[in-house]
Amino acid sequence: MNITELQQSYASHPNVEGVCRLLKDNSVRHLYCGGLYASAASLFSSVLVQRATCPLVFILGDMEEAGYFYHDLTQILGTEQVLFFPSSFRRAIKYGQKDAANEILRTEVLSRLQKGEEGLCVVTYPDALAEKVVSRKELGDNTLKLHAGERVDMNFVTDVLRSYGFEYVDFVYEPGQYAVRGSIIDVFSFSSEYPFRIDFFGDEVESVRTFEVETQLSKEKKESIVIVPDLSHSLEKKGSGGMVSFLDFLPSDSLLAMRDFLWLRERIQTVHDESLTPQAIAARESEENGAITLEGKLIDGGEFTLRALDFRRMEFGNKPTGTPDATVSFHTTVQPIFHKNFDMVAESFREYLSRHYTI
């Protein structure tokens, strides 16, 4: 049985049909799905993602668990509909080391949510949710949208890029840079994994493509693009006034799915209470940008709880938090520990086959 067959089997399961009906009932604000162990939760969730019209946000316990869950979903659904929302820091926030790749992923999620795409799936974890994000207004004010066939002056585009803080270079190789060669503008947006190559014909955008940094060769043709700068620097200058909780950024009809609501609250509170290490402060003070501060840029456990209770919630951990409005019980089991003993694996398979399971 391959992944597609497994997913189809889950899609036709009566319990999954029951969950989908409950999620259409607006009176059900808190749903508990018990008995979903290991990747069973991912397979079950993939069906919900395919049928959803609202954003689904899966909040796992930590970065590693979220990474495994994201990998499972992308193996089933692909990467177009499933997004990963990490912390913007390379290690724990208290070390103060920003990660440009993670900031790209975060900005991409915000941009896609801003567009109002149906059935978008976001996988995240408490350390990422502890950090505030830019408000919808701030993101909109700092977003340049272009599409093939659009009439726009090339000089206007470069002026906007400069005003957004993009750095002019000969060759683009990292986010926040742009280059101009004849009628072509290369720009690396903080909302895209790959940089864009915009080809002009006079005052018209003739074509837009992504390209590989290493080879500088074009990769994929795009009909439209969104260019977003590094908003963290501009917000550091303005203070925390343009920042909100990620949950504040979400549409009100979003569904929050999690294993353990109380653990998320406690972990976010821990992240909020941690201070920057002396080494992190010293390192930042020695840079041109000066010392980093986390004041006003993190939410605490209480704020997370307050915001989360505004949304519909689905829990799929060992036990629910409080009394759910509805409960659906699955009957999956934890995989036995085989210790690389293939005889035990074979015996386990034979036993399942004798009980009329499909493998």
Feature annotation, model-predicted:
Residues M1-I359:
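Conserved beta-alpha structural segments and adjacent helices that either
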